[in-house]
Amino acid sequence: MTSLLDIPELRELDSRKSLVRIPHEEDVPLTPRVRMLIDTAEFRRLARISQLGLVSLVYPAANHTRFEHSLGVYRMALLFLRQLAGDPRFEAAITREDAECFIVAALLHDLGHWPFCHPIEDIRLPGVPSHELFANSFLLEGEIADTLRDEWNLQPREVTALLSEKPRDNRQRILRSMLSGPVDADKLDYLHRDSLHCGVPYGRHFDQQRLIGSLCLNGPGDGLAIRDKGRTAAEMLVFARYVMFSEVYWHHAVRSATAMLQRAFFLLHGQLDLDQLFRQPEHAFITSLTQAAG
């Protein structure tokens, strides 16, 4: 039986041959099939969408992008898989195809984000899709869909199901918990990365290596858990998230600017082609709003 560790991206995790570097001194392996996804126009678009939007008005160095974060989550997903591949229960439950679907989902999890996505979604206006559903327009047809079929031997629907549908069985519950759960690849990356770029220590005060090293399956076998040795690291992760929301994401000046943006979008959205608007990079998005305002 083929080991999960034989997956090309996991084999290349410690390689020096083909990689890209992102802050802070993180080496991200780029296999040919990963590079084919990254080089699509849909994924490159994320390089022109900031990760934190209006937070940069308060923390001026917070100009990192969804592109950088997506690479970071992809790398974190590989670290999760490498740790869990040594768990016999995990390897019995998760096939190679499942693991590769998880790798792709981690890389593409933010594909449907548009500029200032979360504040605009929060208004709940008719005609504004969730970013998960908007991602389907990129994932189910076009170059990314072709690459998934031809290079990864995956059906695009498998990826969208993992990203946006309710898990149907324990296998999907495990994978979903690795991507969106109390301790997940997304959270471990964005807390550290956002903290680093904002110039604050709050999101980096937990032992990431210890936490990953303690990952295992829970008792029922339908999600992630941590061994006792990772308990303190997990508690520090929870506190790090709390402080990042208190001091960064929900900073009073950020919330004020967010309310102004929401008000402007509420007043102008009827004059805009939302599908076209949401496909634009951040600068063009702001220009479109400004022109609509006259």
How should these model regions be labeled?
Residues 1-101, 111-294:
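Histidine-centered, transition-metal-coordinating active-site segments
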Residues 108:
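Aromatic-lined, polymer-binding surfaces characteristic
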